[in-house]
Regions:
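Conserved acidic donor-binding segment of nucleotide-sugar-dependent glycosyltransferases
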Residues: 336-337, 341-348, 356-361
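Aromatic "clamp/platform" in nucleotide-sugar-dependent glycosyltransferases that forms part
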Residues: 285, 304
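A conserved mid-protein helix/loop that constitutes part of the nucleotide-sugar donor-binding site
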Residues: 17-22, 222-245, 251, 262-268
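Nucleotide-activated donor-binding/catalytic signature segment of Leloir-type glycosyltransferases, i.e.
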Residues: 268-284
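Carbohydrate-associated surface elements
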Residues: 177, 199
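Short acidic/histidine- and often glycine-rich active-site loop of Leloir-type glycosyltransferases
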Residues: 314, 327-337, 341-342
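A short, well-ordered alpha-helix in the C-terminal region of glycosyltransferases
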Residues: 349, 356, 363-377
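Short hydrophobic beta-strand element within catalytic cores of glycosyltransferases
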Residues: 321-324
Length: 383
């Protein structure tokens, strides 16, 4: 039995967090002694964490700059001190440091958080994404081996943690396109870098898809669905424009999008500006998207960037006809015209592809047959 510390930000609904919950379950099944340490202990996915896992929150033992404290008010709870530390980080980043010295910013924030004093066999910074967890894992934990995860091929955030990544023994990338990008940035760390697909419990996805679905908003004879955070890389602004084009062509449909995110209100406003707020509906967060996926007619994913999109795996496991943007990470799962469809991320071409697929019943049946036959196996890397 190994003692393993897994680091995360929260357990809010998101692909990374879903994959982390599945990984925790896998580690428990292997009889490992697992602790999950979060920046903030919150989120709807906390209920998916096995009871055998000890779940804790980072302890912040210093308060932020007095000027910032006067702005946001005085608070004493651990979660609020965590908020303070992040607020101090943003303040220092913009005023004192800047992009080129982000590592120094994290070093300052590390002074405000208590170290993890236990000795572990393994530390996994599962969240990655240039988050504070990478700095914490590198400098505030003790373990024989440490690993960090890279979940996306767009590494714009790398400046935040590049000073800390060399302190990890393994760099796990969730797809080959991600691995290539990491090696391009860190050629000296190529021997530590390998692909390890996010583990997804397919049987659990299928079980959860059988749960009753009662949502008065989720109606219509022709339903499209997308699941994911409302952020720039997901391409939802393009989705609004595709919706407007399909409406102009006379197609009667509804496109539902499940997920919270920083761009949600902006996207709802954009839908109104394009006069498609009745056709593209941003549902916000749903704790269990699987029944929605099961009952949709097409699963659409117009992403600009991805790592190894878990939502595509889940849609495949439910034998849904998928149309996704033609980017490297999608090509790892989708073979155009065989087990799904790929399309350039262009409004007119995506609209054309949707109409073409809808008109081809025989092609859709062939795709579903292929999806029923092909295995989805993630066990090799977790043996």
């Amino acid at each position: 039995m190994s003692k393993i510390l897994v680091l995360g930000r929260t357990m809010d609904m998101g692909g990374t967090e879903v994959a982390m919950a599945a990984l925790l379950q896998k580690l428990v099944e292997k009889k490992e002694d697992v602790t999950l340490l979060l920046v903030e202990k919150r989120g709807v996915l906390l209920e998916r964490i096995p009871k055998e896992v000890e779940v804790r929150q980072m302890i912040w033992d210093k308060k932020p700059h007095p000027a910032l404290e006067r702005i946001v008010g005085k608070r004493e709870t651990p979660a609020e001190r965590s908020f303070y530390a992040r607020g101090m980080g943003v303040f220092l980043m913009r005023v004192v440091y800047g992009k080129k010295r982000y590592g120094k910013l994290y070093e300052r924030i590390l002074e405000c958080v208590e170290p993890e004093t236990k000795q572990y066999d393994l530390v996994f910074d599962f969240f990655g994404f240039g988050a504070f967890t990478t700095a914490f894992g590198a400098r505030k934990t003790n373990a024989r081996k440490k690993a960090v995860w890279f979940h996306g091929e767009n590494l714009w955030w790398l400046f935040r943690t590049r000073d800390f990544i060399p302190e990890y023994d393994k760099i796990y990338c969730v797809s080959e396109p991600v691995r290539k990008q990491v090696i391009a940035r860190f050629p000296e760390l190529a021997d530590r870098t390998e692909v390890l697909l996010n583990f997804i419990d397919i049987k659990q996805v299928q079980r959860r898809s059988e749960e009753p679905l009662s949502d008065p908003q989720y109606t219509g004879e022709l339903k499209f669905l997308t699941v994911g955070r409302a952020s720039e890389e997901k391409g939802y602004d393009i989705a609004v424009q595709i919706t407007a084009e399909l409406k102009k062509r006379g197609l009667c449909f509804k496109w539902f999008i499940i997920g919270d995110g920083r761009d949600l209100n902006k996207l709802r406003t954009m839908a109104k500006e394009y006069q498609v707020e009745q056709e593209i509906i941003f549902l916000g967060m749903r704790e269990n998207p699987a029944p929605y996926v099961k009952s949709c007619d097409l699963y659409l994913q117009p992403s600009r960037h991805e790592g190894y999109p878990i939502t595509i795996v889940e849609a495949r496991s439910l034998q849904k006809v998928i149309i996704a943007s033609d980017i490297p990470s999608m090509r790892e799962q989708i073979r155009d015209g065989e087990n799904g469809y790929l399309c350039p991320l262009d409004v007119m071409q995506f609209a054309d592809k949707i109409q073409k697929v809808l008109a081809d019943q025989e092609g859709r049946d062939a795709v579903r047959k292929k999806l029923r036959e092909e295995p989805i196996d993630f066990s090799a890397g977790y043996a």
